[in-house]
Amino acid sequence: GIVLYHRDYREDDKLVKIFTEQAGKLMFFVKHANRSRLNSMIQPLTLADMYLKINDDGLSYIEDIHEVQSFQGINQDLFRLSYATYILALADASIQDRQPDPALFAFLEQTLQLMDRGLDYEILTNIFEMQILSRFGVALNVHECCVCHRVGLPFDFSFRLGGVLCPDHYDRDERRAHWNPNALYLLDRFQAVKFSELETISIHDEMKTELRKCLDQLYDEYVGIHLKAKKFIDSLGSWGEILRNEKNCSRCNGWRSRSTGPSRRGQSSHTRI
């Protein structure tokens, strides 16, 4: 199972939401949690083998936990942690409790593993957002023109048609989105990419901004959920950049003390897809 979140219950107990591979999402009761040996193992973003007592009605119970992985790479970085928390919340919102979904469980685990390894957390989140849309009952066509079915053209998106239009058929929707065709090309790639085939990611910051705009509009139009975790990562755009600059400045100062070469701060951040 993967621990999604926990909250205090009464004075010393906790309710722990766990996404299990076999039984879906369930709420578990942990008595005297702060004094329990399980306390360190029921933190959010914990992956483990769990022995669980699952009741048909009411709360279930954790009997034992083994083989714990706590995603240290994620937990030690505010930005990765924020995005990982968002995809946990997105997975939680996408299916009903007690609804087994081994495919979603595996997809969530793969996303977290790659994020923990240091792959681009923003793009991994974008891929997760695109591929989880089907769990919300949303099926978008970003691969071929909705009218003539041609592929590989500078498409634009039509909210009315739920898909893309080629230049010859832009006139089918006067209120088309006017999105960057390269962003739509990437969204099409994201919709079909398999993590087993993903080795590196390379997308520049300007395109990441375009992708974020497109996905926000898609979720506002077709999904309509407003998660606290999403609001938090949106706020990273303002004060988070200050933290990044301070961190980079600290690294650059240390680097300059060993060399008289140029500063590295001007380099753009990107990885390769």
Report each predicted region and the residues it spans.
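Non-catalytic alpha-helical scaffolds and adjoining flexible linkers that form interface surfaces
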Residues: G1-K14, F19-W255, R265, R272-I273
